[in-house]
Amino acid sequence: MIEDKGPRVTDYFVVAGLTDTSTLLDQEINRTDTNSIGPKAPITDIAVIIKSAGETVPEGYTCVEATPSALQANLNYGSLKSPELFLCYRRGRDKPPLTDIGVLYEGKERLMPGCEVIQATPYGRCANVNNSSTTSQRIFITYRRAPPVRSQNSLAVTDICVIITSKGETPPHTFCKVDKNLNCGMWGSNVFLCYKKSVPASNAIAYKAGLIFRYPEEDYESFPLSPSVPLFCLPMGATIECWDPQIKYPLPVFSTFVLTGSSAEKVYGAAIQFYEPYSQERLTEKQLTQLGLLTLVEKRVVSKPINSNKCICLLSHWPFFEAFKNFLMFIYKVSVSGPHPLPIEKHISHFMQNIPFPSPQRPRILIQLSVHDAFILSQPVSTPLPLSGANFSSLLMNLGPENCATLLLLVLLESKILLHSLRPAVLTGVAEAVVAMIFPFQWQCPYIPLCPLSLAGVLSAPLPFIVGVDSRYFDLHDPPQDVVCIDLDTNTLYVADERKNINWKQLPKRPCKSLLGTLRRLYQQLCSVHRKPQESSAIEMTPIEADYSWQKKMTQLEMEIQETFLRFMASILKGYRSYLRPITEAPSNKATAADSLFDRQGFLKSRDRAYTKFYTLLSKTQIFIRFIEECSFVSDKDTGLAFFDDCIEKLFPDKGVERTEKVDLDSAEDTRLIELDDSQRSEHTVFIMPPEPPPDDGNNLSPQYSYTYFPRLDLKLFDSPQKLKLCFNRHPPGSSITNSPALMAKRTKQEIKTAHKLAKRCYTNPPQWAKYLFSHCYSLWFICLPAYVRVSHPKVRALQQAHDVLVKMRKTDVDPLDEVCYRVVMQLCGLWVNPVLAVRVLFEMKTARIKPNAITYGYYNKVVLESPWPSSTRSGIFLWTKVRNVVHGLAQFRQPLKKTGQKSQVFSISGGQSDQGYGSKDELVKEGADGHAPEEHTPPELTTTELHIEEECDISAIVSKHLQPTPEPQSPTEPPAWGSSIVKVPSGLFDTNNRTSTGSTSTVLFSTQAPVEDAVFSEVTNFKKNGDRGEKKQKHFPERSCSFSSESRAGMLLKKSSLDLNSSEMAIMMGADAKILTAALTCPKTSPPHVTRTHSFENVNCHLADSRTRMSEGTRDSEHRSSPVLEMLEESQELLEPVVGDNVAETAAEMTCNSLQSNSHSDQSRDTQAGAQDPVNKRSSSYATRKAIEREDVETGLDPLSLLATECVEKTSDSEDKLFSPVISRNLADEIESYMNLKSPLGSKSCSMELHGEGNQEPGSPAVFAHPLERSSSLPSDRGPPARDSTETEKSSPAVSSSKTLTGRFKPQSPYRAYKDRSTSLSALVRSSPNSSLGSVVNSLSGLKLDNILSGPKIDVLKSSMKQAATVASKMWVAVASAYSYSDDEEETNKDYSFPAGLEDHHIVGETLSPNTSVSGLVPSELTQSNTSLGSSSSSGDVGKLQCPAGEVPFSRNIKGQDFEKSDHGSSQNTSMSSIYQNCAMEVLMSSCSQCRACGALVYDEEIMAGWTADDSNLNTTCPFCKSNFLPLLNVEFKDLRGSASFFLKPSTSGDSLQSGSIPSASEPSEHKPTSSSAEPDLISFMDFSKHSETITEEASYTVESSDEIKKTNGDVQSVKMSSVPNSLSKRNVSLTRSHSVGGPLQNIDFSQRPFHGVSTVSLPSSLQEDVDHLGKRPSPPPVSVPYLSPLVLRKELESLLENEGDQVIHTSSFINQHPIIFWNLVWYFRRLDLPSNLPGLILTSEHCNGGVQLPLSSLSQDSKLVYIQLLWDNINLHQEPGEPLYVSWRNLNSEKKPSLLSEQQQAASALVETIRQSIQQNDVLKPINLLSQQMKPGTKRQRSLYREILFLSLVSLGRENIDIEAFDNEYGLAYRSLPSESLERLQRIDAPPSISVEWCRKCFGAPLI
């Protein structure tokens, strides 16, 4: 067997003919139906006799006495008084036969040359056959005789008859009618002559043909040579014939045939027949007698030429008939000529082995065979239609329009169809066209285009068939009566009498009318263009010159004819998809029956009633039933079926509705359905030279080869077949869809074409172009999904994530470009056995109003049919659903109570328990006034921060909540229309004064930014009007950010840190955010006495004082990563009603943001410390209005199901700090209710912001702040103040232990504590989801839906835990946490809290704090533990996520959807960086900001996108300023954190990348292993921030974090040795995340030493540059730059890569090294859209990041969690302009400790920046433009535009979430246009406002981090 590979032009060369073993053909054929005597001699003479005159039939003649229907064959039939004339004929071989018979109207026509007229009868009378009087027109019969010397296969008249058409007679089968009436008189019938032509039979013996020779000798594996091939080469048999001497050799006859295999695979044959002399000596006596060579009497041998026929044939899977004809003719010519330098064998092997297959790149191959012989091999026309050898022009030319339409009807109704012709080359092309014209149906019955005589028995088969035969067959056989015979030579259809009424008029009228009209038009064109090919005779022996224009014209006509039939089929089947019935439940035995798959009755009712019979018959045919099956299941026809659906869509856009067909068809006329590939128009031609003759060495003459006839071929002279032949592809390129995972996401050619057209159309429309690019990015993710799922565990969760992304796409109005997204998920559901999810995907498509095409629908049904279904429906899913419904109903009834409860409550310490969630490990515990007692006496787990949550709720968020339109009247202070305000906070709040807005807390401060929350709680909170949604949408991505003001950072900080700052200080330090807070804080001061725990802003100010500097950075970060807590808050924000003064309405129930819990921890810890210092400061912070009231005073969380419980604010006393079971108080009702409302499956990961109280630190150990190193310029850099009393801190922060970030030593904790930690993680889990609640937890658990979770062991855990909940709810949390440990895993990692209010973003920690200022706010435990690690699902650190500030909402994207779909990694936009980095082994900073090569301007991401073209091969973008093209680059920088002491890798079972979220193993021991304090020294040193702030290395922070984390994990997993922490620390199943630069607490505290801290000298965040490596960290890998590809280009390249290398390439270590461009672009886009991915895991083990050594891949999903990817908007590296950007200056200026120390230049810069900030707050952009333009030096070329300077400064200084970029753009545009001309002259092109296209790109994708 020869190994196969690649499409071959031809497969086999065969010689067939008479062999020694051939048997007589007569023995092979059943002769029962043969004619009486076999072939007849040709007619040599005809005569007319007048019987009425007494003339008789001449001797040797036969008289035609009767017509076919037995009427008298009188030529004057029916005439009165006319003579009776009859026709007579004579047969014989004694002279040349007649070749034609005609009729001449004398006087009107001239006699044709070569014809003779019968003017007289044999008896001398006039032979006028007209029945009229003698004076009228005379009519004579004429004939033409063959020449004396003629070829053997020339045709002759073999029969003749007369028909009377007026009596209903028609020409008999195979007879040709002379279309001239013989009777022109008034009386008489219409009489016509008919005659039959055939090849005159000679004396011959027919044998069954055999195989004489084949090449190659061995079979191909995929295509063994069929033994029946010789029969098709010589369908009439191999004959020995005796010819008359005057007969000459005929030219070779070309024929084609098709072999259909059992798999319906077609093989095309092209053959040439010719005759050769046959030696008389080889004949036996019997043969001599049969041939008439041996006289019977004398036994004498007559000398006559004896010949036999032979055939040479090529077999191929491709119908290159014309090329094969040319090649075979060349071979034949060589075989009868000579001498030649090369043998025939060389030419054959050269053609078969050295001719490349035509491809789109080289569509034409010119093959030079010799000096005179050449021909072109053209690529097959590539359309989605099945490949065939159809010749539609031949069909139409030979049958005409009406007969074509009738034939179409016959085929559709599955008749027995017999095609016949004397031209064998015509048969195959026409038969192929007949089968192709019913597309999308496929003929299911026997199909033999050229049937050998030996197989003719099929004509008697009792089933439909399409068979083609040589017309000579009818010389031997009569056709069966029920067969429809179609004579291609005479253009006639012969239908049995009982079916005479069948014709084209039975087709539906309008489609048929359109069909016939078009066919008639094309028929006329064909007649003018068509060259009659010499198919029946030989091919021209002259050199062949390709007639391109004729070929092109014919190809065009061919496609138009095919398109006409396609249009007809589309019009009769339109709307059929609406009647397909998908399988939506476990399949039964009848699931695959046609009636189960298709609503036949519904379909019939929708059709034209007048043609119900036609449709009824059609719907019962095998072709229709098979069509329905193919539409319902995967088949190799899927591509064609999808194309057909597209055709219907084009012709009848409203498929489901029957519109008037007339309109449809008229409009359809102009629609092109089949289009030529671009390659068909290409002139690229490959020239192939003939084989080289052997070199002539001069001595020995090379042999010459001469032939007289075709030789016996010698295998030795052939070139040996090449060993490596490409495997044959059974289907034409692009026509097959395979099941291989690598090609799951492969688009069909039609989908690619459609995408190209759509791209060109969208390119001219800015909003559409942005959406188009955005949609392509999702497609990229789905293309990589098979690889992602393969390396994910569990698979169910990965699949659920995919489903959630589909939901997200719909909710954010992403229009899928094609169905690849859905198709891939469905196929994966089949691969990983999840039919239920496949059903959900199908219904998701329906919800999105997308009708699955054939490919998608086929995969869907295949999955649901073949996959095992869950056995029982009454499972936990069912039961939990009942519980959910009941609880949800109760929750709805309680809504009104909440409102009233809220109004009566004092804000007090909101969020005490309800926010945190009862039973959460971090349950709030009341602290005494001094805040120390609890530390001493309360077990760590109980010392939880009560206010923590409150802090999270940041004022702005709260206010913004109220800003949204609500039924309540809005405060007069709010601005009229927030859309037009750049700053989303009323400017009044930005006063530097402590302006009190007592009554205005409920007024709008920021425009709502929590669309997502909406989604989550929408069901519960119906107070909101729809109007809110629009505004909320704006918040979409960016606003989720954690900026201080918006995301409740304030809240977080407030609790703890607020104790240390006074409001005015804070306001100054924090800028706008603080001011807002300050304003809001004035209310709290009046809070009722009973509220023990209040926090003053003053404390906050401590931290904020200096954090202002960092705030901007934080803001930036925050935009990307608001902590989940914040998110929760935001979400809850929606639930809150506006409140006046202190009575902040809070819907606590809705607020079960467990994320808040995380905050409460941090708060509490802060409080504990701060409380001691400033008990007074513990005043209620009304700023937290946004969150539900925390019932910090609830001692035992009684009545966990009471929603009102959350709203009661009880008095708290110091004594309340006493220990109580925190877990029990978790509000389960809220949790469950929240779950019901939770719509965010993707958020499965939810930010694990656990609220851990601060861990107990050993007295000496400073509360080490795992303070992250500062992030680069675009990243915020926070520094936390030094811890005040580490001891105190330790004590006061029991929860810290569970906080991974926390640094500091912890004392061994009691088991109680240990289990509590666990519960915390649960709470974190819950918290993590933006709307955390149990439900959210559950939801987040696997990104899943309750249904998925509740199966298997997890549900048991949950059930059992529920039982315990009655007694000890905390245990439940423990159980659940472990059951869903994956959530914990990440969760715990991030468990602590989002940074204290804005710490992370706002760098709230101020340098002004003295080292003792208690780390309030930055207590190790709180700070160190960021609430969400990247992995956390709430959007952790999702810098890349589409962050659109309020105005930037991606089109009408329904933000609701966006939230849950967040990938775990980026899932928490609120993610605090500290936690992010705890688990971080590598930080990767990416920026797409590029520099135009021509003008040097900086081109930012959205501008690059807007500049891309619709060409998927063009890598360039267009510079928006100089319009030149350049290649944008993605710049990547790394910060390798693996050397840090606290970082160590540990395998985790998580299946998600950090970004995708982590899923730790489900079972981990929960015992707590104490850690010794030996590591303390390392940690302690970090606490003295004043001294070491700059030097705190990230490693150090790691150490701290790790120790914390380890403790926190309570030894859940295993103990690990750490270099800096000698003791083995127990660690959870997740690796530590490194809390790092993004504004997290890990950042260095002392900015003064590094003014550039917030501003990296590198393009990317400074954190990258922090090389201070106390612990010997490894050096960071060098930066990488790769071309930044458009999603169109990237998709094309990715598809090509997967097709060539398989999908495994995506998760192999070589991917990043071998395909860096594709890799980094995918990483960029997946982060940009916040989609889960395992790609980052490849970075850790890549050669690039390991000094050239490729490390083995351990666990991609695990490794991915260890890589934190940050997408940056700006790239400082590219700034070549002197000075630094304004936003960098602002950061640096604000990082200085004392303004008095600033130089004059710095003070001037500070004044400028401050002026600009204030102007922006007042919506004044003109002033900043003027200020900056005045400072510009005229004539100098700038790189930084005024637009970017002002925008970036606004975002950084005022808080990203507070800036509506869209409003800013509007204001900037107005200001720019209002500038006087002289001012405009000073400006440069780069200063112009962005174009609409740029704005839309940013709206869709959001803005990266700045």
Curated annotation (Swiss-Prot):
Residues 904-917, 1154-1171, 1292-1302, 1548-1564, 1611-1628 have a biased composition (Polar residues). The modification Phosphoserine is found at residues 702, 736, 740, 971, 987, 1000, 1043, 1058, 1096, 1123, 1181, 1221, 1240, 1248, 1274, 1321, 1333, 1342, 1620, 1624, 1626, 1637, 1796. It is found in: Cytoplasmic vesicle membrane; Cell membrane; Cytoplasm, Cytosol. Guanine nucleotide exchange factor (GEF) activating RAB10. Promotes the exchange of GDP to GTP, converting inactive GDP-bound RAB10 into its active GTP-bound form. Thereby, stimulates SLC2A4/GLUT4 glucose transporter-enriched vesicles delivery to the plasma membrane in response to insulin. Residues 191-363 form the uDENN domain. This is DENN domain-containing protein 4C. The modification Phosphothreonine is found at T966, T973. Keywords: Cell membrane, Cytoplasm, Cytoplasmic vesicle, Guanine-nucleotide releasing factor, Membrane, Phosphoprotein, Protein transport, Transport. It comes from Mus musculus (Mouse). One of its GO terms (cellular component) is insulin-responsive compartment. The lineage of its organism: Eukaryota, Metazoa, Chordata, Craniata, Vertebrata. Residues 384-520 form the cDENN domain. It comes from the Eukaryota. PPR repeats lie at residues 818-852. Residues 1423-1437 have a biased composition (Low complexity). InterPro entries: cDENN_dom, dDENN_dom, DENN_C, DENN_Domain_GEFs, MABP, TPR-like_helical_dom_sf, Tripartite_DENN, uDENN_dom. Residues 522-640 form the dDENN domain. Residues 904-942, 963-984, 1154-1184, 1246-1317, 1410-1440, 1548-1577, 1596-1628 are annotated as: Disordered. PROSITE patterns: DENN, MABP. GO terms for molecular function: guanyl-nucleotide exchange factor activity. Residues 920-939, 1281-1291 have a biased composition (Basic and acidic residues). Its main location: membrane. Phosphorylated in response to insulin.
